[in-house]
């Protein structure tokens, strides 16, 4: 018998993490009055158990382990973890436990502790008379696709199926037999290596999919009975806010799918708690479909909601607790999944055969009565012969005759009376009228009917027929014979007491005709009502879908508008700031350029003075030394030539390639060398300043280009805003057309404003470009530059006024758009009212139809006959025999197919092994090649290091001609040595 039980809901709050402790507002918003209550921001919530942040893993498991014990007793169980991302779901479940975590026993979660409990209870409670088989499977729901974590190569789409024996299951999912808790943890680690995980701001290792670990336990006793229990360990992905997690790209798409599936799960729970709701949307997502048995089905479910106690996550915590409070009122109808043994089935079969024999005898007696009424010897008003009365003696005689006959139910005869009474005729072979359903028990006739349903089980070595019969039906079978005897003894008729008018054949014929007419009329009415109900439901569903689509579109448009408004405001502020920064940069750069120009002029004057000083000194030196150096005219000519070369090179600012600097320095004195160094430093500074000026000019150009690009981006955003406004207007016009209103909204002047703003921006850009070009060139008159700057500032002020006017116009347009949104909301409310009216009408129709159908069903039930019910029973028995035979044949064929598939799988595994061996051999060969290449590279590195170590630094020694010759000789030797080494290195690398 099925029993109802509520879903158990428990709540756990995790401790504050390091990020929350680092915040200034490191305060909690949660208080715990007792073990079953929690208060969050003044809102109280009550659950079966509440765990504080100081609670341990052991305490949580002790409150949850009853579900695992129920699975060992033959029930289905589910442990479900739900909560915000980073709230501790995976830690509580223990699905991501690594090998190092097993050393710290206190940190183990529900899954490893549950595995330990399962195998310990089997070892302690089993007395050797029972056999246990445990199978494990592991799956994840990623982006609304079911993936087999134990066999990731299983790329085919796994489908969800439903059957009476297995309930809801995944077709083609890998199941592994396990013999210890270590086997299960190894499978979990294999599955976790294939799971989808990503890093977010809220969690360093955030699960991007829902995972379900399924442990199926089958217990077979010595008498042949079986118990099956299934434990579902569900670790849901956390609900996320993109603003907090910072998800982008693929992670953002994953977050959308996760939030969508969790919202659909919430819709199912809301529908289950609503008493007026008839349809539960389990098929809207894969997650809700797999959890259908856990939510209102044949499963004992425990929901564990996890939350954060920090004030920053108070909204997510309250929504999570509301989810758990709503799920707490769901009731599940659970029963033990048990198959009866052969002895129990034999008792049931014996009781049924006994009932059948009694019913067959009773049907023979009734058929004999009917044949008597149809015969010519029957006259209305005459008493019924005693041999045909359905009393106990006649029934015993008929039973003996049926047992002695070979056909097992052939013709039966009764002994005649002294005055030659009528002989009993055999059972008529005339066709019986169609069967009409009848209630199982009636107060007037004390007769019972028992239904037997047989199904073949695929699991196990041999499939037998399993019958499910309630205890009430077995008790009714045991009391059947006594009730029938009492009926027969009480139904004897007296010849003297009113035998007139007991059976009127004309009335029976008329009643049968009326019954057939009533059947036809009621069937026609029922078909009409069914058609009308189907049409109404289709219309209702279509209107609901249209309304939902309209709501979704409106919500999306609102979100897009709000995002674009915020982006537009941010971009405007950024543009203004960039304009201000650009003006400040331009002014600062102009000042820098002017200062650099003044420095360059000063340096030029200094350089000219140095050159004049050098020329004067050269002339004075020539005049003083000319007399003393009369004999050395050639040398003086050389020195004069050298000084002329130096002066020419200094005047030109560049040195020729043919001049040797060392020769020049050798003939100079110390003062001349110092003057030369000063002049060279000055020239280097001048060159550096010129380079800086060029860099500043290029920076100005780049800033102007960036400013132009920012203006173009602003224009693009404004054009996108206008397009969005047009789309919104088109949506508004389409909604008005659907409501048969042909009034079109007035056109907004946004396009004109955009054109004016783009023209103004272009003018402003041209002014800026001209101003920047004029400011980049050095001006002769400072007064004209100041006037130009004032003129540019005036233009900028005018442009700012224009931009402000355009902003005001855009704000006016936004107010108009808000008015249009309010109108749309009013229309949506009207549509909702219309849909509610249609719903009320459909409910009224349904109530009327249910009343009418109930009346017609009562009439039909009152018009049923006992003969038809008996014939229905016989037909059901025949069909059951045929179905059992067909099921045995199907089971044999399925066994053959399984054997063939297992052989095919073995061949596939062999082929895969061979392929893996070939791949390993190829990898080994590639490793050998890589080792050879590494050795060659190491040799090349050694040779290059030797070359680098062999190089010598050549120092140029200042002095006489001999030292210069030795320096040149060492240069030539070093060059030849390096050339040889480079040629050798090239040959090595080739």
Swiss-Prot record:
Residues 513-948 form a coiled coil. Keywords: ATP-binding, Coiled coil, Cytoplasm, Cytoskeleton, Microtubule, Motor protein, Nucleotide-binding, Transport. It comes from the Eukaryota. Its main location: cytoplasm. The keyword Cell membrane does not apply. It is found in: Cytoplasm, Cytoskeleton. Residues 406-418 have a biased composition (Gly residues). One of its GO terms (cellular component) is microtubule. Residues 466-485, 733-781 have a biased composition (Low complexity). ATP binds at residues 83-90. Residues 401-485, 732-788 are annotated as: Disordered. Pfam families: Kinesin. GO terms for molecular function: actin filament binding; ATP binding; microtubule binding; microtubule motor activity. Signal peptide: none annotated. GO terms for biological process: actin filament bundle assembly; microtubule-based movement. Residues 6-330 form the Kinesin motor domain. Microtubule-associated force-producing protein that plays a role in organelle transport. Its motor activity is directed toward the microtubule's plus end. May connect microtubules to actin filaments. Associates with actin-based structures in cells and is likely involved in the organization of actin cytoskeletons in such structures. Composed of three structural domains: a large globular N-terminal domain which is responsible for the motor activity of kinesin (it hydrolyzes ATP and binds microtubule), a central alpha-helical coiled coil domain that mediates the heavy chain dimerization; and a small globular C-terminal domain which interacts with other proteins, vesicles and membranous organelles. Belongs to the TRAFAC class myosin-kinesin ATPase superfamily. Kinesin family. Kinesin subfamily. Interacts with actin. PANTHER family: CENTROMERE PROTEIN E, CENTROMERE-ASSOCIATED PROTEIN E. This is Kinesin-related protein 5. It comes from Dictyostelium discoideum.
